[in-house]
């Protein structure tokens, strides 16, 4: 299973917020933003910062996808 951040990108569109604005508002590092863009694993702390910034829950920004399908 791998993490998918498609929900995060859709939420940003819905909130009319750019990835750059999320980066600044959440205080995430550039390397964490790059990991998110590449669909790589990020820390729970990074996900917590995003949730606080967007006023949402973790299930609103990430889902786990079965790679075997």
Where are these regions (language model features)?
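Short amphipathic recognition helices of helix-turn-helix/homeodomain-type DNA-binding modules
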Residues: 61-69
């Amino acid at each position: 299973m791998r993490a998918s951040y498609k929900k995060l990108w859709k939420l940003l569109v819905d909130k009319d917020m750019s990835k750059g604005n999320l980066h600044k508002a959440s205080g995430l590092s550039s390397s964490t933003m790059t990991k998110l863009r590449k669909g790589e694993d990020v820390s729970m702390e990074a996900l917590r910062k995003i949730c606080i910034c967007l006023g949402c829950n973790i299930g609103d920004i990430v889902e786990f996808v079965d790679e075997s399908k």
